[in-house]
Amino acid sequence: GEDRIYRELRAAVPVVDAAILKLVRLCGGFQVRCRGEERLREFLRTVPCGRGQYGIDAFLSAYLDSLLTYGRAVGELVVAGERLRAVCWGDVTALEVREGANALDMELWGPDDRGQMHRLPWQELLLFTTLNPEPEHPYGVSMLRGMPFLADILLKIYNTIGVNWERAGNVRSS
């Protein structure tokens, strides 16, 4: 559906991909202040966050990238021995969001090994954020929502430039 279009749009139109990456970089980082500030800073700098990445900045960059691209982002707090051991981001396109016991509750569902959707365990350790939710899109709206139309025009322009470049100097095409 739309998620595939957004992913392909970023791959096909480099300026769109660069713009999202620039927005992520412009958001910058943050500072923490507390009694154990040095220990917390060290944790935030070294916390594993998945896919060979370390540090809360890497997690936040991937999380924000997903939020801008798909209108929603998902993450997981990994706890072991009653301590936070990692903060990982996930593929929000593989999940379903379903209404919980009431309209204010929601549950994240994901596929098992056979592709069947099941309620994910440990919901309290999952992070889920939406961008600009609307009544008809309660689980977020992509920043790229209006881009497929524009991308179609850009792809036609790029294609025409390519055809013209190939024809340059060709007497038959003159």
Where are these regions (language model features)?
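Structured, contiguous alpha/beta core segments that scaffold functional sites
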Residues: 1-174
